[in-house]
Regions:
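Membrane-helix interface segments
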Residues: 38, 59-60, 148-150
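Hydrophobic transmembrane alpha-helix segments characteristic of membrane transport
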Residues: 44-51, 137-141
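Helix-loop interface residues and adjacent transmembrane-helix termini in multi-pass membrane transporters
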Residues: 15, 35, 57, 132, ...
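Transmembrane alpha-helix interface motif
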Residues: 1-38, 46-51, 165-254
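Alpha-helical transmembrane segments and their membrane-interface exit regions
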Residues: 48-57, 71-76
């Protein structure tokens, strides 16, 4: 079982109405992106952290570790905005290298800060949803919102095959490592190609078996999964509305 999936099953917010969590995550994500505000992004980051770690019971160390993944990509991506090579030094910093300067501007630094804050806060919205809601509940909420059945079915199948292929991939990796299949770059490439071809063949076999199993159970184009019904509560809806209102006010006043 994947880490995020395991944490979602253990979350204290798992049995909160999935449609409420989905709408909160989507609305907060939209506000965070549209506002282009560092204050709104910081507030979203803090609120989602409190909800996920404080209310959901997700371990803080795991949450921070998950946030480090997008943070690494953000740092690498925003480096091009901050760092410039020019013959003219800019107003933020300048490192002289002969006739050239490795330099940056205050405007570039602020733009990078805004971009990182917005992107990282947007990721926390998705983490809130994925760490506190199991996949079947998310798909059920999407169906209630009249999301196309074809897309929800594809999402469920892709989700299913991640688990189907993850275990064989792990076993193949361990087997290759035991046989020194990654001792240098050439053998790593060869081992990766062999694993890819083996997984491709396995995926075809498993997909045919899965389709035969669904056909034997009167598959009509829609995949139906039993979900535990959790009624929406007025108090939870009021909290969501209050949070969104606060974010809008911070956006307008900021």
């Amino acid at each position: 079982m994947l880490l995020i999936d395991k944490l979602s099953y253990r979350s204290k917010l798992r049995y909160v109405n999935a449609s409420e969590k989905l709408m909160y995550a989507v609305l907060t994500l939209i506000l965070c992106i549209l506002s282009h505000s560092v204050r709104v992004a910081a507030l979203v980051f803090v609120i989602n952290g409190i909800l996920t770690v404080g209310k959901g019971g997700i371990p803080l160390s795991r949450y921070i570790r998950l946030l480090m993944i997008p943070t690494a990509f953000l740092i690498a991506g925003t480096a091009a905005i901050v760092i410039n090579i020019s013959k003219v030094p800019m107003d933020a910093f300048a490192l002289e290298l002969g006739e050239w300067y490795i330099t940056g501007s205050v405007e570039g630094l602020y733009l990078a800060l805004e971009l990182c804050a917005t992107a990282l806060s947007s990721v926390t919205c998705l983490y809130f949803l994925s760490l506190n809601t199991v996949m079947t509940d998310i798909l059920d909420a999407l169906r209630k919102l009249h999301f196309p059945a074809l897309l929800t079915g594809l999402m469920l199948l892709v989700y299913r095959f991640i688990f189907v292929l993850f275990q064989p991939a792990s076993a193949i990796t361990v087997s290759q490592q035991a046989r020194l299949g990654n001792r240098d770059f050439k053998t790593r490439v060869r081992s990766f190609g062999a694993m890819g071809s083996a997984l491709f063949i396995l995926a075809l076999k498993r997909s045919n078996m899965l389709y035969d199993a669904m056909e034997s159970r009167c598959y009509d184009g829609n995949i139906r999964v039993l979900t535990r019904m959790q009624p929406a509560r007025a108090g939870e809806i009021a909290v969501i509305a209050a949070i969104e209102l606060i974010l809008v006010l911070v956006w307008i006043c900021g």
